[in-house]
From Swiss-Prot:
Bilayer disposition of the protein: Multi-pass membrane protein
Cellular component GO terms held in the UniProt record: membrane
Tissue specificity of this protein: Expressed in leaves, flower buds and developing seeds.
Span of the annotated motif Histidine box-1: 106-110
Main enzyme class: oxidoreductase
Keywords annotated in UniProt: Fatty acid biosynthesis, Fatty acid metabolism, Lipid biosynthesis, Lipid metabolism, Membrane, Oxidoreductase, Transmembrane, Transmembrane helix
Motif position, Histidine box-3: 316-320
Pfam family of the protein (one): DUF3474
Entry protein name: Delta(12) fatty acid desaturase FAD2
Function: Catalyzes the desaturation of oleic acid to linoleic acid. Introduces a double bond at position 12 of 16:1(9Z) and 18:1(9Z).
Length: 383
């Protein structure tokens, strides 16, 4: 059973027991290598099929189009009481489907869509721009996240605070209402704040922004493609502006804005729960290495949404080990690598609502264990 999970007590009539104590992931250098793990995975799991990859794009966009048609032609004709219920349902369902589209674009950024980089970048640019994501900008910062996962100094996103970095105001939010408020703000504003102001991102000595070609996030050779990302965003914004002029701002907000808000919320939630858990360590430069860093992630269970999100939720450990592997092979690979990883593999089946509150409560900052001089840091919550 994975860290933080629950189990049924067979002698207690099936009643739930108290949660088991969360066991820490081993932080010593593992007795296996990336090569050992790769050898165990069937070779076909690394094959990328253009036809199969496009089939997922077609499927997702078909479902999204059907939902759009229903909302545009029927929800707007409903009487007010029913419309007030139908619109949030549309936003939630369409947002989930478009999150799947987002995941495919993310896969393009990893060169996991096809064997052709130009095709991956073209598809990724179109899909991500439609969702107001700067494709190349995020592709490069996300690549650095994969290169530095688990490093408290060089990871790119959801970098945990050290105890010394916790603001004095945090104590006023360290209560149930404060945690709920923190979650609401994070899920609604976290994604645009990260892209625009690098909130929760790696520390840079000057302003870092995903829309700025001269941002310290990027190297000189990457800057031209940041302009392309910005052009893609501006093109979509222009289309939305024209739609607002012809169909009205309310139409744009209900048909596009609501689902996009759900997409943005899921992106933050999924990433947060993939890399935040009381069992997971972080490392400074004296201890960090790529393999241990890649293993500081955890698979989760989103129920039926696992499939809607193309299993980015429950195969994330495998994804961090082999990011060019297409999502439709990731589950098979995950099943194969579990016995090799042993306790280094983490899965938590805790319900998502409970998990996001628990992690907000328990994972406020990281610190070393007392009287330990190594560079291993663990989540704490005592302010």
């Amino acid at each position: 059973m994975g860290a933080g999970g629950r189990m049924q007590d067979p002698t207690n009539g099936g009643n739930k027991t108290e949660p088991e104590p969360i066991q820490r992931v081993p932080h010593e250098k593992p007795p296996f290598t990336v090569g050992d793990i790769k050898k165990a995975i069937p070779p076909h799991c690394f094959n990328r099929s253009v036809i199969r990859s496009f089939s997922y794009v077609f499927y997702d966009l078909t479902i999204a189009s059907i939902l759009y048609y229903i909302a545009n032609n029927y929800i707007s004709t409903l009487p007010s009481p029913l419309a007030y219920v139908a619109w949030p349902v549309y936003w939630a369902v369409q947002g989930c489907v478009l999150t799947g589209v987002w995941v495919i674009a993310h896969e393009c950024g990893h060169h996991a869509f096809s064997d052709h980089q130009w095709l991956d970048d073209t598809v990724g640019l179109v899909l991500h721009s439609f969702l107001l994501v700067p494709y190349f900008s995020w592709k490069y910062s996300h690549r650095r996240h994969h290169s530095n996962t688990g490093s408290i100094e060089h990871d790119e996103v959801f970098v945990p605070k050290l105890k010394s970095g916790v603001r004095s105001t945090a104590r006023y939010l360290n209560n149930p209402p404060g945690r709920i408020l923190t979650l609401l703000v994070t899920l609604t504003l976290g994604w645009p704040l990260y892209l625009t102001f690098n909130v929760s991102g790696r520390y840079y000595d000057r302003f870092a922004c995903h829309f700025d070609p001269n941002s310290p996030i990027y190297s000189k050779r990457e800057r031209a493609q940041i302009f392309i990302s910005d052009a893609g965003i501006l093109a979509v914004v222009f289309v939305l502006f024209r739609l607002a002029m012809t169909k009205g701002l309310t139409w744009v907000l209900t048909m596009y804005g609501g689902p996009l808000l759900v997409v943005n919320g899921f992106l933050v939630l999924i990433t947060f729960l993939q890399h935040t858990h009381p069992s997971l360590p972080h490392y400074d430069s004296t201890e960090w290495d790529w393999l241990r860093g890649a293993l500081t992630t955890i698979d989760r269970d989103y129920g039926i949404l696992n499939k809607v999100f193309h299993n980015i939720t429950d195969t994330h450990v495998a994804h961090h080990l082999f990011s060019t592997m297409p999502h439709y092979h990731a589950m098979e690979a995950t099943k194969v690598i579990k016995p090799i990883l042993g306790d280094y593999y983490q899965f938590d089946g805790t319900s998502i609502f409970k998990a996001m509150y628990r992690e907000t409560k328990e994972c406020i900052y990281v610190d070393k264990d007392e009287e330990v001089k190594d560079g291993v840091y663990w989540y704490r919550n005592k302010i």
